[in-house]
């Protein structure tokens, strides 16, 4: 893998390069993944609200005369149209928003799995998280010793 400077991560030939990831790097990677997940969730919530607004407008416009004037914002400009012209465009937009929300949901699930795998790989525990289940699983032999070497993230 290449880091942000474009260099491939390898040690100076000592063979200890694989386990040389510092706790700060692990925390930075974990926080980056969490931020990406929050961004996806935020965008999905924003689109859900927009979808609800579209549904509300569509339901309202279905009840009025098709020749009635209505106004629509197009590229920052308010344009006068008729209900007959606007309704199909709104329904098309609503379908596109639904597709985008589905895609974001899939990406959010994938990011959640990636985050959990990262946590397990680097033994990351969040502050306030219950440590009793982890102690039960690792109570055999050297497993208890390995669990104390994890990274604690606030």
UniProtKB/Swiss-Prot annotation:
Residues 1-20, 126-154 are annotated as: Disordered. Residues 126-139 have a biased composition (Basic and acidic residues). Gene3D superfamilies: 1.10.287.370. It comes from the Eukaryota. GO terms for cellular component: cytosol; mitochondrion; nucleoplasm; prefoldin complex; RPAP3/R2TP/prefoldin-like complex. This is Prefoldin subunit 2. The keyword Mitochondrion applies. Binds specifically to cytosolic chaperonin (c-CPN) and transfers target proteins to it. Binds to nascent polypeptide chain and promotes folding in an environment in which there are many competing pathways for nonnative proteins. Residues 9-18 have a biased composition (Gly residues). GO terms for molecular function: amyloid-beta binding; protein folding chaperone; unfolded protein binding. CDD domains: Prefoldin_2. Belongs to the prefoldin subunit beta family. It is found in: Nucleus; Cytoplasm; Mitochondrion. Keywords: Chaperone, Cytoplasm, Mitochondrion, Nucleus. InterPro entries: PFD2, PFD_beta-like, Prefoldin. GO terms for biological process: negative regulation of amyloid fibril formation; positive regulation of cytoskeleton organization; protein folding. Residues 140-154 have a biased composition (Low complexity). Heterohexamer of two PFD-alpha type and four PFD-beta type subunits. Component of the PAQosome complex which is responsible for the biogenesis of several protein complexes and which consists of R2TP complex members RUVBL1, RUVBL2, RPAP3 and PIH1D1, URI complex members PFDN2, PFDN6, PDRG1, UXT and URI1 as well as ASDURF, POLR2E and DNAAF10/WDR92. Interacts with URI1; the interaction is phosphorylation-dependent and occurs in a growth-dependent manner. Pfam families: Prefoldin_2. Its main location: nucleus.
């Amino acid at each position: 893998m290449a880091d942000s400077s474009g260099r491939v991560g390898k040690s100076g030939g000592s063979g200890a390069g694989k386990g040389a990831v510092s706790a700060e790097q692990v925390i930075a990677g974990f926080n980056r993944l969490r931020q990406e997940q929050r961004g996806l969730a935020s965008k999905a919530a924003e689109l859900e609200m927009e979808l609800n607004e579209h549904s509300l407008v569509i339901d309202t416009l279905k009840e009025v005369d098709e020749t009635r004037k209505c106004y629509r914002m197009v590229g920052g400009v308010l344009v006068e149209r008729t209900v007959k012209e606007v309704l199909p465009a709104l329904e098309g937009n609503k379908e596109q928003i639904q597709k985008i929300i589905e895609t974001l949901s899939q990406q959010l699930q994938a990011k959640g799995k990636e985050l959990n795998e990262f946590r397990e790989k680097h033994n990351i525990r969040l502050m306030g998280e219950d440590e009793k289940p982890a102690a039960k699983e690792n109570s055999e032999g050297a497993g208890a010793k390995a669990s104390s070497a994890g990274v604690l993230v606030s």
